């Protein structure tokens, strides 16, 4: 009886190990990246930034990814992040999928702590936005901004390297 139980436990452990290694392999073959980080809107509340995350699944198996949380930093200092959602997206084998748009609100009060004389710069920022020149808008602020995201790929935590929006 003990031999049967031992064989069953060894079989279950082996099956579990194979599953974990396969999940790790699929996660390693999956690449994730930020797509088109941009300023979407400028209001009295602050700057509204948007971005998408692209998932490139080069494996033969489908991948489950949670909706990423996008974080905005300046020189490594946390500024704000998108709202976390309990949403899982299945990425089909050998395909590229863009995950829903993430929106981040960067309040003027947060920017005030980073930018001296921000009040004098706001008119130039608004003028740049009205002209449709978001790159110039970020240059007007004079604040280095980076974005990164965190997610779970097949249950394994993933954090992207920071992407400079303005450096």
Per-region residue spans from a language model:
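Single-pass alpha-helical membrane anchors
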Residues: 1-21
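Intrinsically disordered, low-complexity Pro/Gly/Ser/Thr-rich segments with frequent PxxP/GP/PP motifs
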Residues: 75-124
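Low-complexity, acidic Ser/Thr/Pro/Gly-rich terminal tails and inter-domain linkers that flank the onset
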Residues: 18-47
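Asparagine-centered strand-capping/turn motif at beta-strand->loop junctions
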Residues: 55-62
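Terminal connector regions
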Residues: 107-167
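Hydrophobic core residues within well-ordered beta-strands of beta-rich domains
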Residues: 47-49, 68, 97
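Short coil-to-beta strand junction motifs in C2/discoidin
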Residues: 63-69
